[in-house]
Structures are given as structure tokens and as C-alpha cells.
Amino acid sequence: MANKGFFIITDISGYTEYLTESELDHAHEILQSLFDAQLKHIKFPLKISGFRGDAIFMYTPELCFVNPQTFLETLENLYIVFLETLRQMQFNTTCPCRACRNINKLDLKMCIHYGEYIVQKLGDREELLGADVIVPHRMLKNHVIEQTGVKAYALFSETAAGTLRLSELSQPLIPHTEFYEHLGEVKMQVFDLAPVWENAQERKRNFVSKEDAWVSLEKDLPH
């Protein structure tokens, strides 16, 4: 029996170029850290279905779905933790190798679709099957950057955006359309992740704990 749910792929932008232009040992460690940072924050209602090279494929069964706002915040938090990990590695490294110098070429994009699937058992593994399962993988190949200038984004199919009522929950979305062989025209909505990071940094600037401060000053005042 077919189920319904959301399919989510997080994909490291610039992965291929970065890997081919960098020393493998350090590049592997850096990419592993970025994957691990995401994996630690992938929690219910998200379930990991598999890995595709530079991408993590997840899904949320409709029965496990919480609410649109929580779902969107989960995706936003994944981006924040990804970029925090990347920036920390940039800040802390003194290594002059290409892998460490080129960390800033990496970013994250997400593709989200909603539809039907069935679960197929393969030994001790489960795999999702269905035409809708294919859609987010195809959405990874797009012209979003060229046509919108948005480099870090969550790309929602129109079906996913409508089901989530994104127009009521988030910042203005950018309409986008791609044409894929066998799928035809796929209408989408682009959610810019840059403001998500900026807002997170603004909240951090408003409060710095003593433990996180680089410099602290304590002074006894006269009674």
C-alpha cells in the first residue's frame, strides 16, 4: 500500500570541484565533518533513507508529520549547523593546503518534494520506491543560481510548497520552473537560506555567554 510523505535531499554545493582541486586526506576530513554535523541534527520526524555521494536523502511519512512551521525550522536548523561547522573550520585552521583554503567554496542546498512512495525491504535495509521519490533527485540539477542569483537555498516543488502552505509561513519565495526528461515541467519555489543564517548570527550577537567571549572584563565597584 502506498504511503504519502515529504522527501528531502541535502546536497553539498561545490562538492565535485572542491574534491578534484583539493588534497584528498584533508578534503575527506572536512567533508566528513560537514556530514556528521548534519547527521547529529537529523531527528524525528525526519528519517534517513540513504546517501548519494555528496547528499543525504531523508523522508518524513505523512503520519509522522508534526506541522509546517516545525518542518521548516528543522530544515533551517540543518543549514545553520552546516554553516556553523564550515565557518568554525575556516576560523580554526592554519593549514595552507588547498582543501583548507577552499572550504569557503562549499555550501548547502536542499530539494524537497511531496508525494507517494512504497517501502521495499532489501535485506536489512529499506528503500523507497515511486515516481515521486525520483523528483527531488532530479531537482538537484537546476538553474536556480543562474536565474535567481541565490546560492544557498531550499528548493520546494510546487506540490511540497502548497502542502506546507509556505506562502503563509516564510519570507517571500521565488517562483522557478525546470523541465526534466520523463517528468516534463516541474514548478518550484526557491527559499533563500542566506537570511536564515544572517538572522541566526544576529540572535547570537545579541547574547554572548562568558564561556563564548574572547575577552571578558570584571571589576569590583566601590560599595
Language model feature labels by segment:
Residues 4, 40-43, 47, 105, ...:
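Context-gated lysine
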Residues 145, 149-223:
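Intrinsically disordered, glycine/charged-rich C-terminal tails and inter-domain linkers
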Residues 64-175:
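Catalytic beta-strand-to-alpha-helix segment of the class III nucleotidyl cyclase homology domain
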Residues 1-2, 51, 103-105, 128, ...:
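A generic fold-level signal
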Residues 1-77:
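Catalytic NTP-binding/metal-coordinating core of nucleotidyl cyclase/transferase enzymes
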